């Protein structure tokens, strides 16, 4: 469809049942050809580095957000729940900061999640690739893959036996999980300078000129 959601986070997802969820709040949804880098809205922990650094939205930015939603679904902890959601966090994300993974996650899901977090947009999977990768592990997968998946899930469950689920009461008072305008995000501006090309030509009588200057100096 060539659209970007531009505000994808767990607060914009509703569940009908265990197997069916819907993405909501398409108020900021735009075609991929439309960007408003001077008017950036979002929830900082779910926003991609390129969006926070220069107000740039792409389909890959939504994939980054999907990776953060995966973290919350798999661990119960929203990203960066224990620190202020301010310009310092935005700067950290732009410098490569990643959220803490609070518990053991089945390896096949962890690998997909961390690919979505890749700092470089072009290195993140597309939505089509995500569908294909996740589809390999559904209930219709072959016996060998199902065995690997079950083993990874069992290992994670065993490791998480005493895991403490997320308690909203431990959330930092300045951790904000609602979409808001972020005035500190500005489009990247490149300074340009007028340049002039100068042509330098060595005259044929350069030796005579040098000798004449030497005589005058003496």
Feature map (PLM): residue ranges:
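A conserved short helix/loop substructure at the end of the activation segment
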Residues: 117-129
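Conserved C-terminal C-lobe helix
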Residues: 104-117
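Activation segment
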Residues: 54-59
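Conserved activation segment of eukaryotic-like protein kinases, specifically the C-terminal portion
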Residues: 37-51
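Catalytic-loop of the protein kinase fold
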Residues: 2-15
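Conserved catalytic-loop aspartate of Hanks-type protein kinases
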Residues: 62
């Amino acid at each position: 469809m060539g659209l970007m959601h531009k505000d994808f986070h767990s607060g914009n997802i509703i569940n009908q049942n265990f197997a069916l969820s819907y993405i909501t709040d398409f108020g900021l949804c735009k075609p991929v050809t439309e960007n408003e880098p001077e008017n950036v809205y979002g929830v900082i922990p779910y926003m991609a580095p390129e969006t926070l650094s220069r107000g740039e939205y792409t389909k890959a930015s939504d994939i980054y957000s999907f990776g953060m939603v995966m973290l919350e679904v798999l661990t119960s902890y929203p990203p960066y729940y224990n620190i202020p959601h301010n310009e310092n966090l935005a700067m950290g994300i732009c410098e490569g900061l990643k959220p803490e993974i609070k518990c053991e996650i089945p390896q096949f899901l962890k690998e997909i999640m961390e690919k979505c977090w890749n700092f470089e947009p072009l290195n993140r999977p597309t939505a089509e690739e995500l569908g294909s990768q996740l589809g390999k592990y559904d209930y219709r997968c072959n016996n060998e893959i199902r065995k690997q998946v079950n083993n990874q899930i069992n290992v994670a469950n065993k490791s998480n036996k005493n895991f403490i689920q997320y308690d909203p009461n431990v959330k930092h008072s300045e951790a904000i999980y609602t979409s808001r305008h972020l005035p500190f995000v500005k489009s990247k501006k490149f300074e340009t300078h007028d340049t002039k090309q100068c042509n330098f030509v060595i005259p044929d009588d350069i030796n005579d000129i040098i000798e004449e200057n030497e005589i005058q100096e003496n």
